[in-house]
Structures are given as C-alpha cells and as structure tokens.
Amino acid sequence: MTRVKRGYIARRRRTKIRLFASTFRGAHSRLTRTSTQQKMRALVSTHRDRGRQKRDFRRLWITRINAVTHENRVSYSYSRLIHDLYKKQLLLNRKILAQIAISNRNCLYTICNESIK
C-alpha cells in the first residue's frame, strides 16, 4: 500500500474544533471526541433557538401591549386593538407597538382612540 502524506490536516481539524469548544467547561473543551459531540449539540441548539427566539419576542411584545391596553380601559383588550388597527389600516407591527407602549403610553392611548373611531 502506498503511503499517503496528509501533512497536518487532522491536527488542523482538531484545532478548529478545540477553538470552537474552548469556552466549554471540563472535558468538553479538552477531549477531542467529547468536544466534537458538544460542538454538534451546540450547533443544533443554536439552530433550534433561532426559531424559538422569534416566538419568544413576539409573545413578549403581545404581553406588553396587552398590559398597557388593560391599564387604559378595562374592557379593551389586545385582540380588539389589533383588530381595530387592521380595520383602520394603521400598519404598525407588534414590535413597534410594544416600544411605544414602554416609552410613551400616551401615544399608545391616542393610537387606541384613533382605531376605535
């Protein structure tokens, strides 16, 4: 069998994995096999959580808007506000509405009143 001269390919691959796993704790940052497995798990988690992050922020925005609208009037709810905004064709997304709710509640109250009229 002929000899294959690969140079430092394997060492370069392991070094890349070690650099990725350098912030992991314990054997996950030192041993090649466990660091490879942890790298795969970390990449799976980041891929999954990128989608989950979008859902979590949307839930947070909805909660903030709903809290401010309930302070304004007891009978007014988040779902009715969004429905009225769509009817009036006021195109404000939930992120912007949540920022307005935090920074300037009076502005959100005027938006609510405009959507009712």
UniProtKB/Swiss-Prot annotation:
GO terms for biological process: ribosomal large subunit assembly; translation. Pfam families: Ribosomal_L20. PANTHER family: 39S RIBOSOMAL PROTEIN L20. Binds directly to 23S ribosomal RNA and is necessary for the in vitro assembly process of the 50S ribosomal subunit. It is not involved in the protein synthesizing functions of that subunit. Belongs to the bacterial ribosomal protein bL20 family. Keywords: Chloroplast, Plastid, Ribonucleoprotein, Ribosomal protein, RNA-binding, rRNA-binding. GO terms for molecular function: rRNA binding; structural constituent of ribosome. SUPFAM superfamilies: Ribosomal protein L20 (SSF74731). GO terms for cellular component: chloroplast; ribonucleoprotein complex; ribosome. CDD domains: Ribosomal_L20. This is Large ribosomal subunit protein bL20c. It is found in: Plastid, Chloroplast. The keyword Cell membrane does not apply.
